Protein backbone atom coordinates (compact mmCIF):
# COMPACT_ATOMS: atom_id res chain seq x y z
CA UNK A 1 0.00 0.00 0.00
CA UNK A 2 1.46 3.36 -1.06
CA UNK A 3 0.89 5.59 1.97
CA UNK A 4 -0.15 9.24 1.79
CA UNK A 5 1.06 11.73 4.45
CA UNK A 6 -1.40 11.34 7.33
CA UNK A 7 -0.83 14.88 8.60
CA UNK A 8 -2.43 16.55 5.57
CA UNK A 9 -5.85 14.98 6.15
CA UNK A 10 -7.44 17.43 8.59
CA UNK A 11 -10.90 17.48 10.16
CA UNK A 12 -12.54 19.80 7.61
CA UNK A 13 -10.16 19.82 4.65
CA UNK A 14 -6.85 18.59 3.26
CA UNK A 15 -3.89 20.89 3.92
CA UNK A 16 -0.10 20.71 3.90
CA UNK A 17 3.22 22.30 3.00
CA UNK A 18 3.70 22.44 -0.76
CA UNK A 19 6.55 20.31 -2.06
CA UNK A 20 6.84 18.45 1.25
CA UNK A 21 3.66 16.82 2.52
CA UNK A 22 1.52 18.21 -0.32
CA UNK A 23 2.97 17.49 -3.77
CA UNK A 24 1.43 17.37 -7.23
CA UNK A 25 1.67 13.58 -7.10
CA UNK A 26 -0.22 13.42 -3.81
CA UNK A 27 -2.91 15.79 -5.11
CA UNK A 28 -3.31 13.76 -8.30
CA UNK A 29 -3.96 10.61 -6.24
CA UNK A 30 -6.49 12.46 -4.09
CA UNK A 31 -8.17 13.78 -7.25
CA UNK A 32 -8.42 10.23 -8.60
CA UNK A 33 -10.09 9.12 -5.34
CA UNK A 34 -12.48 12.10 -5.37
CA UNK A 35 -13.40 11.48 -9.01
CA UNK A 36 -14.05 7.82 -8.17
CA UNK A 37 -16.28 8.75 -5.22
CA UNK A 38 -18.22 11.25 -7.33
CA UNK A 39 -18.73 8.76 -10.15
CA UNK A 40 -19.87 6.13 -7.65
CA UNK A 41 -22.57 8.55 -6.48
CA UNK A 42 -23.72 9.19 -10.03
CA UNK A 43 -21.96 12.56 -10.29
CA UNK A 44 -20.46 13.14 -13.73
CA UNK A 45 -18.50 16.38 -13.22
CA UNK A 46 -16.50 18.29 -10.59
CA UNK A 47 -15.83 22.05 -10.71
CA UNK A 48 -12.28 23.03 -9.72
CA UNK A 49 -11.30 26.52 -8.56
CA UNK A 50 -8.13 27.78 -6.91
CA UNK A 51 -7.05 30.70 -4.77
CA UNK A 52 -4.16 33.01 -5.59
CA UNK A 53 -1.33 30.98 -4.09
CA UNK A 54 1.73 30.54 -6.26
CA UNK A 55 1.41 26.74 -6.13
CA UNK A 56 -2.24 26.86 -7.24
CA UNK A 57 -1.88 26.30 -11.00
CA UNK A 58 0.34 23.22 -10.59
CA UNK A 59 -1.80 21.63 -7.87
CA UNK A 60 -5.10 22.41 -9.61
CA UNK A 61 -3.68 20.83 -12.77
CA UNK A 62 -2.71 17.69 -10.84
CA UNK A 63 -6.15 17.53 -9.21
CA UNK A 64 -7.84 17.83 -12.61
CA UNK A 65 -5.63 15.05 -14.01
CA UNK A 66 -6.70 12.80 -11.15
CA UNK A 67 -10.40 13.58 -11.55
CA UNK A 68 -10.23 12.86 -15.27
CA UNK A 69 -8.37 9.59 -14.62
CA UNK A 70 -11.51 8.39 -12.82
CA UNK A 71 -13.58 9.06 -15.94
CA UNK A 72 -15.15 12.16 -14.40
CA UNK A 73 -15.36 15.53 -16.16
CA UNK A 74 -13.29 18.31 -14.58
CA UNK A 75 -14.51 21.88 -15.05
CA UNK A 76 -11.69 24.38 -14.50
CA UNK A 77 -13.13 27.70 -13.28
CA UNK A 78 -9.73 29.30 -12.69
CA UNK A 79 -8.54 31.63 -9.95
CA UNK A 80 -11.61 32.50 -7.85
CA UNK A 81 -12.62 32.76 -4.17
CA UNK A 82 -13.71 29.51 -2.52
CA UNK A 83 -17.38 30.62 -2.32
CA UNK A 84 -17.35 31.18 -6.09
CA UNK A 85 -16.24 27.56 -6.44
CA UNK A 86 -19.13 26.50 -4.19
CA UNK A 87 -21.46 28.64 -6.33
CA UNK A 88 -20.17 26.90 -9.46
CA UNK A 89 -21.49 23.57 -8.18
CA UNK A 90 -24.99 25.10 -8.29
CA UNK A 91 -24.57 27.28 -11.37
CA UNK A 92 -23.08 24.48 -13.51
CA UNK A 93 -25.44 21.85 -12.11
CA UNK A 94 -22.64 19.47 -11.14
CA UNK A 95 -23.24 19.44 -7.33
CA UNK A 96 -19.52 18.71 -6.74
CA UNK A 97 -16.53 21.02 -6.48
CA UNK A 98 -13.03 21.35 -5.08
CA UNK A 99 -11.34 24.59 -4.09
CA UNK A 100 -7.54 24.40 -4.15
CA UNK A 101 -6.81 26.74 -1.26
CA UNK A 102 -4.55 27.23 1.72
CA UNK A 103 -7.17 29.53 3.28
CA UNK A 104 -5.39 31.70 5.87
CA UNK A 105 -2.30 29.50 6.23
CA UNK A 106 1.22 30.81 5.40
CA UNK A 107 2.19 31.15 1.69
CA UNK A 108 4.01 27.79 1.55
CA UNK A 109 0.79 25.91 2.38
CA UNK A 110 -2.02 24.82 0.12
CA UNK A 111 -4.94 22.43 0.38
CA UNK A 112 -8.34 21.22 -0.81
CA UNK A 113 -11.88 22.05 0.35
CA UNK A 114 -14.24 19.52 -1.18
CA UNK A 115 -17.96 19.09 -1.86
CA UNK A 116 -19.20 15.85 -3.46
CA UNK A 117 -22.87 15.48 -4.38
CA UNK A 118 -23.80 18.54 -2.32
CA UNK A 119 -22.07 17.35 0.86
CA UNK A 120 -18.92 18.95 2.26
CA UNK A 121 -16.38 16.24 3.06
CA UNK A 122 -15.22 16.28 6.70
CA UNK A 123 -13.94 14.00 9.46
CA UNK A 124 -14.45 10.32 8.50
CA UNK A 125 -15.27 11.18 4.87
CA UNK A 126 -11.84 12.80 4.47
CA UNK A 127 -10.15 9.79 6.06
CA UNK A 128 -12.05 7.53 3.65
CA UNK A 129 -10.60 9.45 0.69
CA UNK A 130 -7.12 8.82 2.09
CA UNK A 131 -7.82 5.12 2.59
CA UNK A 132 -9.36 4.78 -0.85
CA UNK A 133 -6.39 6.39 -2.58
CA UNK A 134 -3.93 4.24 -0.61
CA UNK A 135 -5.60 0.91 -1.34
CA UNK A 136 -6.15 1.77 -5.01
CA UNK A 137 -9.95 1.48 -4.86
CA UNK A 138 -10.29 3.68 -7.93
CA UNK A 139 -12.34 3.91 -11.10
CA UNK A 140 -10.52 4.30 -14.38
CA UNK A 141 -11.56 6.24 -17.45
CA UNK A 142 -10.69 9.29 -19.49
CA UNK A 143 -12.86 12.16 -18.38
CA UNK A 144 -12.64 15.40 -20.31
CA UNK A 145 -11.41 18.72 -18.98
CA UNK A 146 -13.13 21.96 -19.92
CA UNK A 147 -13.00 25.60 -18.85
CA UNK A 148 -15.89 27.66 -17.50
CA UNK A 149 -16.21 31.23 -16.26
CA UNK A 150 -18.74 31.65 -13.45
CA UNK A 151 -17.43 34.89 -11.92
CA UNK A 152 -19.86 37.05 -13.92
CA UNK A 153 -22.83 34.87 -13.01
CA UNK A 154 -21.83 34.99 -9.32
CA UNK A 155 -21.68 38.79 -9.34
CA UNK A 156 -24.99 39.07 -11.22
CA UNK A 157 -26.69 36.70 -8.79
CA UNK A 158 -25.66 38.83 -5.79
CA UNK A 159 -26.36 42.20 -7.44
CA UNK A 160 -29.83 41.03 -8.48
CA UNK A 161 -30.71 40.02 -4.91
CA UNK A 162 -29.03 42.59 -2.66
CA UNK A 163 -30.09 46.24 -2.67
CA UNK A 164 -28.30 49.08 -0.90
CA UNK A 165 -30.64 51.87 0.26
CA UNK A 166 -27.92 54.46 -0.46
CA UNK A 167 -24.35 54.46 -1.78
CA UNK A 168 -21.66 53.73 0.82
CA UNK A 169 -17.98 54.60 0.86
CA UNK A 170 -16.04 51.64 2.23
CA UNK A 171 -12.48 50.55 2.93
CA UNK A 172 -11.89 47.10 1.44
CA UNK A 173 -8.84 45.03 2.43
CA UNK A 174 -8.39 41.80 0.45
CA UNK A 175 -4.96 41.09 1.97
CA UNK A 176 -3.67 40.16 -1.52
CA UNK A 177 -5.94 37.11 -1.32
CA UNK A 178 -8.14 35.83 -4.13
CA UNK A 179 -11.12 37.92 -2.96
CA UNK A 180 -9.39 40.73 -4.85
CA UNK A 181 -10.29 39.00 -8.13
CA UNK A 182 -14.02 39.52 -7.49
CA UNK A 183 -14.81 41.79 -4.52
CA UNK A 184 -13.89 45.21 -6.01
CA UNK A 185 -16.12 44.64 -9.04
CA UNK A 186 -18.92 43.15 -6.96
CA UNK A 187 -19.09 45.97 -4.43
CA UNK A 188 -18.76 48.66 -7.10
CA UNK A 189 -21.76 47.07 -8.85
CA UNK A 190 -23.67 47.24 -5.55
CA UNK A 191 -23.12 51.00 -5.54
CA UNK A 192 -20.15 51.35 -3.21
CA UNK A 193 -17.27 53.77 -3.53
CA UNK A 194 -14.23 51.69 -2.60
CA UNK A 195 -10.97 52.66 -0.95
CA UNK A 196 -9.00 49.53 -1.93
CA UNK A 197 -6.24 47.99 0.16
CA UNK A 198 -4.15 45.12 -1.22
CA UNK A 199 -6.74 43.99 -3.76
CA UNK A 200 -4.04 42.73 -6.18
CA UNK A 201 -3.94 38.93 -5.97
CA UNK A 202 -0.43 37.96 -4.82
CA UNK A 203 0.13 34.56 -3.24
CA UNK A 204 3.23 35.74 -1.39
CA UNK A 205 0.99 38.04 0.74
CA UNK A 206 3.53 40.90 0.77
CA UNK A 207 1.57 43.35 2.97
CA UNK A 208 -0.02 41.41 5.81
CA UNK A 209 -1.41 37.95 6.37
CA UNK A 210 -4.97 37.55 4.97
CA UNK A 211 -6.65 36.54 8.23
CA UNK A 212 -9.16 39.12 9.52
CA UNK A 213 -9.74 37.15 12.73
CA UNK A 214 -6.40 38.54 14.00
CA UNK A 215 -6.64 42.22 15.06
CA UNK A 216 -3.14 43.02 13.78
CA UNK A 217 -4.30 42.19 10.23
CA UNK A 218 -6.98 44.90 10.45
CA UNK A 219 -4.54 47.69 11.37
CA UNK A 220 -4.43 49.01 7.79
CA UNK A 221 -8.23 49.15 7.62
CA UNK A 222 -8.39 51.03 10.94
CA UNK A 223 -5.73 53.52 9.80
CA UNK A 224 -7.42 54.12 6.42
CA UNK A 225 -10.83 54.67 8.05
CA UNK A 226 -9.20 57.32 10.22
CA UNK A 227 -7.49 59.02 7.26
CA UNK A 228 -10.44 59.04 4.81
CA UNK A 229 -14.17 59.76 4.85
CA UNK A 230 -15.05 56.09 4.35
CA UNK A 231 -17.93 54.95 6.58
CA UNK A 232 -17.10 51.29 7.22
CA UNK A 233 -14.27 48.82 6.67
CA UNK A 234 -14.45 45.22 5.48
CA UNK A 235 -11.70 42.63 5.07
CA UNK A 236 -11.53 39.11 3.64
CA UNK A 237 -9.40 36.10 4.40
CA UNK A 238 -7.12 34.40 1.88
CA UNK A 239 -9.83 32.49 0.02
CA UNK A 240 -12.78 34.83 0.59
CA UNK A 241 -15.02 32.67 2.76
CA UNK A 242 -14.63 34.79 5.94
CA UNK A 243 -15.39 38.44 6.67
CA UNK A 244 -13.86 41.01 9.00
CA UNK A 245 -15.70 44.23 9.89
CA UNK A 246 -14.42 47.52 11.38
CA UNK A 247 -16.44 50.63 12.29
CA UNK A 248 -15.44 54.21 11.43
CA UNK A 249 -13.90 54.74 14.88
CA UNK A 250 -11.77 51.59 14.60
CA UNK A 251 -13.87 49.12 16.59
CA UNK A 252 -13.58 45.54 15.34
CA UNK A 253 -17.01 43.88 15.15
CA UNK A 254 -16.28 40.23 15.79
CA UNK A 255 -18.26 37.58 13.89
CA UNK A 256 -20.58 36.60 16.76
CA UNK A 257 -21.77 40.22 16.96
CA UNK A 258 -22.02 40.38 13.16
CA UNK A 259 -24.31 37.36 13.47
CA UNK A 260 -26.60 39.33 15.82
CA UNK A 261 -27.14 41.94 13.10
CA UNK A 262 -27.73 39.29 10.43
CA UNK A 263 -30.09 37.32 12.71
CA UNK A 264 -32.29 40.34 13.45
CA UNK A 265 -32.53 41.08 9.73
CA UNK A 266 -33.28 37.50 8.66
CA UNK A 267 -35.78 36.86 11.47
CA UNK A 268 -37.82 39.89 10.36
CA UNK A 269 -38.63 37.84 7.24
CA UNK A 270 -38.40 34.32 8.73
CA UNK A 271 -40.15 34.53 12.12
CA UNK A 272 -39.48 31.49 14.29
CA UNK A 273 -36.39 30.61 12.27
CA UNK A 274 -33.58 28.62 13.84
CA UNK A 275 -30.21 30.41 14.03
CA UNK A 276 -27.15 28.17 14.40
CA UNK A 277 -23.93 29.34 16.04
CA UNK A 278 -20.82 27.57 17.34
CA UNK A 279 -19.75 27.05 20.97
CA UNK A 280 -17.20 29.87 20.81
CA UNK A 281 -19.84 32.58 20.30
CA UNK A 282 -20.99 35.14 22.87
CA UNK A 283 -23.59 34.21 25.49
CA UNK A 284 -25.47 37.37 24.47
CA UNK A 285 -26.41 35.75 21.15
CA UNK A 286 -29.07 33.29 22.36
CA UNK A 287 -31.22 35.88 24.21
CA UNK A 288 -30.81 38.27 21.25
CA UNK A 289 -32.10 35.60 18.85
CA UNK A 290 -35.08 34.84 21.12
CA UNK A 291 -35.81 38.57 21.51
CA UNK A 292 -36.07 38.82 17.72
CA UNK A 293 -38.41 35.84 17.43
CA UNK A 294 -35.89 33.13 16.56
CA UNK A 295 -34.74 29.82 18.02
CA UNK A 296 -31.04 29.64 18.98
CA UNK A 297 -29.09 26.42 18.38
CA UNK A 298 -25.53 26.08 19.65
CA UNK A 299 -23.42 23.66 17.60
CA UNK A 300 -19.93 22.30 17.05
CA UNK A 301 -17.15 24.49 15.68
CA UNK A 302 -16.04 23.70 12.10
CA UNK A 303 -17.35 25.10 8.82
CA UNK A 304 -18.18 21.66 7.42
CA UNK A 305 -20.05 20.63 10.60
CA UNK A 306 -22.06 23.87 10.75
CA UNK A 307 -22.89 23.57 7.04
CA UNK A 308 -24.15 20.02 7.59
CA UNK A 309 -26.34 21.13 10.52
CA UNK A 310 -27.74 23.99 8.43
CA UNK A 311 -28.68 21.52 5.72
CA UNK A 312 -30.24 19.10 8.22
CA UNK A 313 -32.34 21.72 10.04
CA UNK A 314 -33.15 23.99 7.06
CA UNK A 315 -32.19 26.93 9.30
CA UNK A 316 -32.05 30.25 7.42
CA UNK A 317 -28.74 31.38 8.95
CA UNK A 318 -25.65 30.11 10.76
CA UNK A 319 -22.34 31.58 11.84
CA UNK A 320 -19.07 30.81 13.54
CA UNK A 321 -16.78 32.89 15.72
CA UNK A 322 -14.04 32.27 13.13
CA UNK A 323 -15.91 34.44 10.61
CA UNK A 324 -17.69 31.83 8.48
CA UNK A 325 -21.29 32.98 7.92
CA UNK A 326 -23.84 30.80 6.13
CA UNK A 327 -26.99 32.29 4.60
CA UNK A 328 -29.68 29.89 3.41
CA UNK A 329 -32.24 32.70 3.30
CA UNK A 330 -31.82 34.28 -0.19
CA UNK A 331 -28.59 32.30 -0.77
CA UNK A 332 -27.27 28.74 -1.04
CA UNK A 333 -26.22 27.87 2.52
CA UNK A 334 -22.45 27.84 2.02
CA UNK A 335 -20.00 30.10 3.86
CA UNK A 336 -19.29 33.20 1.80
CA UNK A 337 -17.41 36.25 3.07
CA UNK A 338 -18.21 38.32 -0.02
CA UNK A 339 -21.94 37.64 0.17
CA UNK A 340 -21.91 38.27 3.93
CA UNK A 341 -20.24 41.61 3.21
CA UNK A 342 -22.97 42.48 0.70
CA UNK A 343 -25.72 41.59 3.18
CA UNK A 344 -23.96 43.63 5.88
CA UNK A 345 -23.86 46.74 3.69
CA UNK A 346 -27.49 46.23 2.68
CA UNK A 347 -28.43 46.52 6.37
CA UNK A 348 -26.05 49.39 7.19
CA UNK A 349 -27.13 51.43 4.15
CA UNK A 350 -30.56 51.89 5.72
CA UNK A 351 -29.02 54.13 8.42
CA UNK A 352 -27.71 57.67 7.96
CA UNK A 353 -24.82 56.62 10.21
CA UNK A 354 -23.63 53.31 8.75
CA UNK A 355 -21.84 52.32 11.95
CA UNK A 356 -24.81 52.96 14.27
CA UNK A 357 -26.48 49.52 13.88
CA UNK A 358 -23.14 47.86 14.75
CA UNK A 359 -22.33 50.15 17.68
CA UNK A 360 -25.76 49.49 19.22
CA UNK A 361 -25.24 45.71 19.41
CA UNK A 362 -24.88 44.31 22.96
CA UNK A 363 -21.32 43.59 24.07
CA UNK A 364 -19.44 42.38 27.14
CA UNK A 365 -15.81 41.87 28.20
CA UNK A 366 -14.25 38.78 26.63
CA UNK A 367 -10.92 37.24 25.72
CA UNK A 368 -9.71 36.35 22.25
CA UNK A 369 -9.10 32.68 21.54
CA UNK A 370 -6.30 31.41 23.78
CA UNK A 371 -4.35 28.30 22.76
CA UNK A 372 -2.99 25.80 25.28
CA UNK A 373 -0.32 23.90 23.34
CA UNK A 374 0.08 20.18 23.98
CA UNK A 375 1.44 17.05 22.33
CA UNK A 376 -0.57 15.26 19.61
CA UNK A 377 -3.61 13.53 21.15
CA UNK A 378 -3.29 15.20 24.55
CA UNK A 379 -5.94 17.93 24.05
CA UNK A 380 -8.72 15.33 23.68
CA UNK A 381 -7.46 13.48 26.77
CA UNK A 382 -7.38 16.68 28.83
CA UNK A 383 -10.93 17.62 27.82
CA UNK A 384 -12.17 14.11 28.68
CA UNK A 385 -10.66 14.48 32.16
CA UNK A 386 -12.04 17.98 32.54
CA UNK A 387 -15.53 16.76 31.69
CA UNK A 388 -15.27 13.92 34.20
CA UNK A 389 -13.32 15.48 37.06
CA UNK A 390 -13.35 19.27 36.60
CA UNK A 391 -14.88 21.32 39.43
CA UNK A 392 -16.52 24.63 38.63
CA UNK A 393 -18.17 26.12 41.70
CA UNK A 394 -21.14 28.35 41.00
CA UNK A 395 -21.69 27.04 37.46
CA UNK A 396 -25.28 26.91 36.21
CA UNK A 397 -24.76 24.64 33.18
CA UNK A 398 -22.11 22.42 31.56
CA UNK A 399 -22.42 22.14 27.77
CA UNK A 400 -20.48 19.25 26.23
CA UNK A 401 -21.42 19.22 22.53
CA UNK A 402 -17.91 20.37 21.56
CA UNK A 403 -15.41 20.34 24.40
CA UNK A 404 -16.65 21.82 27.68
CA UNK A 405 -18.47 25.14 27.94
CA UNK A 406 -19.30 26.11 31.52
CA UNK A 407 -22.04 28.71 31.99
CA UNK A 408 -22.21 30.97 35.06
CA UNK A 409 -24.83 33.57 36.01
CA UNK A 410 -22.36 36.25 34.92
CA UNK A 411 -20.29 34.68 32.14
CA UNK A 412 -18.89 31.52 30.55
CA UNK A 413 -15.65 29.65 30.00
CA UNK A 414 -14.89 27.29 27.12
CA UNK A 415 -12.23 24.64 26.64
CA UNK A 416 -12.34 22.55 23.46
CA UNK A 417 -9.81 20.45 21.57
CA UNK A 418 -8.92 21.87 18.16
CA UNK A 419 -9.63 19.47 15.31
CA UNK A 420 -6.82 20.93 13.22
CA UNK A 421 -3.83 21.46 15.55
CA UNK A 422 -2.77 19.90 18.91
CA UNK A 423 -4.07 22.70 21.13
CA UNK A 424 -6.89 23.25 23.60
CA UNK A 425 -8.81 26.37 22.54
CA UNK A 426 -9.95 28.51 25.47
CA UNK A 427 -12.30 31.49 25.49
CA UNK A 428 -13.94 33.48 28.27
CA UNK A 429 -16.66 36.12 28.54
CA UNK A 430 -18.30 37.84 31.50
CA UNK A 431 -20.41 40.80 32.60
CA UNK A 432 -17.34 42.63 33.94
CA UNK A 433 -13.59 42.34 34.35
CA UNK A 434 -13.77 40.90 37.87
CA UNK A 435 -16.11 38.10 36.79
CA UNK A 436 -13.89 37.41 33.76
CA UNK A 437 -10.83 37.01 36.01
CA UNK A 438 -12.77 34.76 38.42
CA UNK A 439 -13.97 32.42 35.65
CA UNK A 440 -10.46 32.22 34.18
CA UNK A 441 -9.19 31.37 37.66
CA UNK A 442 -11.76 28.55 37.95
CA UNK A 443 -10.58 27.09 34.64
CA UNK A 444 -6.90 27.47 35.53
CA UNK A 445 -7.43 25.52 38.77
CA UNK A 446 -9.56 22.85 37.08
CA UNK A 447 -7.11 22.33 34.20
CA UNK A 448 -3.99 22.10 36.39
CA UNK A 449 -5.84 19.74 38.77
CA UNK A 450 -6.58 17.21 36.02
CA UNK A 451 -3.30 17.77 34.10
CA UNK A 452 -0.52 18.87 36.51
CA UNK A 453 2.39 20.75 34.98
CA UNK A 454 0.54 22.04 31.93
CA UNK A 455 1.28 25.67 30.97
CA UNK A 456 -2.02 27.55 30.99
CA UNK A 457 -1.82 30.59 28.64
CA UNK A 458 -3.50 33.10 30.97
Question: What residue spans do the PLM features occupy?
Answer:
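An N-terminal, well-structured beta->alpha segment
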Residues: 1-65, 69-70, 147-168
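N-terminal small/polar loop signature for handling phosphorylated ligands or for N-terminal nucleophile
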Residues: 40, 45-109, 156-157, 185-246
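Short glycine-rich phosphate-binding loop at a beta-alpha junction
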Residues: 43-51, 75, 169-171, 273-279, ...
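Proline/glycine-rich low-complexity loops and linkers
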Residues: 84, 127-156, 160, 248-321, ...
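Glycine-rich phosphate-binding loop
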Residues: 95-103, 107, 225-247, 252, ...
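Gly/Ser/Thr-enriched, mixed-charge loops and adjacent short helices
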Residues: 110-228
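Phosphate-binding and adjacent anionic-ligand microenvironments
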Residues: 270-427, 432-458
Amino acid sequence: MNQLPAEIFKAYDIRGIVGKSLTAGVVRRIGHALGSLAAEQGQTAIAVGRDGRLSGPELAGALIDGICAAGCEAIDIGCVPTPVTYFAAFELGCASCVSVTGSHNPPDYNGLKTVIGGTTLALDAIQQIKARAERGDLRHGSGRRRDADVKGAYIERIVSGVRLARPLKIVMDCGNGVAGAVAPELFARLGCEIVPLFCEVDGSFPNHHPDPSKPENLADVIRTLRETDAEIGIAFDGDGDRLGVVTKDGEIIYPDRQLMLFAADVLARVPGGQIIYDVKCTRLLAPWIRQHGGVPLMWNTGHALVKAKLKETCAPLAGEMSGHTFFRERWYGFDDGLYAGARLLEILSRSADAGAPLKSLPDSPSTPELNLKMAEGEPFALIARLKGEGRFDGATERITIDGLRVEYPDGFGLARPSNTTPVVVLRFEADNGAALARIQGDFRRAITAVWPGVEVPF
